[in-house]
């Protein structure tokens, strides 16, 4: 069933590109959403450009590709867009070559085109370090920023997360501490930030009015798109909750039961 939201009316005839969130839209955990493979094949046959979005800051793009290929999806590595990839594009656009990675080691793969400089970097990339993010590391990074004209690029700013059945600090508080101590504002890249959406659309060579966001998360996916003037559809899979339908502050343009409904909507436009 198709249900319209209250903000924009989508002109489906203008749509040339699709931003598909991965977790919750295409798959849930280690299982494809029912009918997702067939739906994506249909969308590709209609000649839509597709970018697969994820907010993960712990898994390099090649590993995500391996997972999607196991699902037998027709996809190449450059179809996948993550905060590290967005950060990489941002660095190139701003002619930044020397960086310090405050991320897990696996993410070095996504930054292999850059010089790792632990003395005088032009930018520090902050990702998820979990238990390795301690007082010593925070001080080390503080000194680098304090002593140099160094940008702080945060791949996300989540306040807390749940790991090993316990709630704990995520990247956001560490980023806030560095902002406060250095009097510098970090550049935030990742959903729902405008930087993330602007970079992926630019990478597709399309305008905002030519793309459509399909997501399950009312805040990161739908909110991020809507606040960037991008039309959005929410699926009733993944993180979708019934209370999303009565959220007075944020509504998608449409809701559908799952990605399976998407090809018919776009084809009938």
Give, region by region, the residue ranges found by the protein language model.
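Asp-based, Mg2+/Mn2+-dependent phosphohydrolase catalytic module
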Residues: 2-37, 42-46, 59-78, 85-269
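Conserved phosphate/oxyanion-binding catalytic-loop motifs
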Residues: 56
């Amino acid at each position: 069933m198709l249900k319209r939201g209250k903000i924009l009316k989508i002109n489906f005839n203008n749509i040339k590109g699709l931003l598909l969130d991965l977790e919750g839209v295409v798959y849930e955990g280690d299982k494809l959403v029912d009918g997702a493979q067939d739906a994506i094949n249909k969308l590709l046959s209609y000649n839509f450009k597709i970018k697969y979005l994820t907010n993960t800051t712990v898994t390099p793009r090649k590993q995500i590709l391996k997972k999607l290929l196991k699902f037998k999806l027709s996809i190449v590595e450059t179809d996948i867009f993550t905060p590290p990839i967005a950060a990489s594009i941002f660095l190139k656009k701003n002619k930044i070559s020397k960086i310090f990675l405050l991320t897990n080691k696996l993410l070095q793969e996504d930054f292999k085109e850059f010089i790792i400089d632990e003395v005088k970097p032009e930018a520090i990339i902050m990702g998820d370090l979990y238990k390795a993010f301690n007082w010593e590391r925070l001080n080390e990074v503080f000194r680098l920023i304090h002593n140099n004209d160094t940008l702080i690029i945060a791949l996300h700013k989540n306040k807390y997360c749940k790991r090993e059945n316990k709630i704990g600090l995520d990247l956001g508080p560490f980023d806030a501490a560095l902002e406060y101590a250095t009097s510098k504002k970090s550049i935030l890249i990742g959903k729902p930030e405008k930087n993330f959406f602007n970079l992926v659309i630019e990478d597709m060579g399309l305008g905002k009015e030519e793309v459509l966001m399909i997501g399950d998360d009312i805040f990161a996916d739908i909110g991020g798109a809507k606040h960037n003037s991008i039309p959005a559809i929410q699926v009733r899979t993944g993180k979708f909750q019934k209370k999303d339908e009565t959220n007075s502050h944020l509504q998608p343009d449409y809701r559908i039961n799952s990605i399976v409904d998407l090809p018919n909507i776009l084809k009938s436009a």
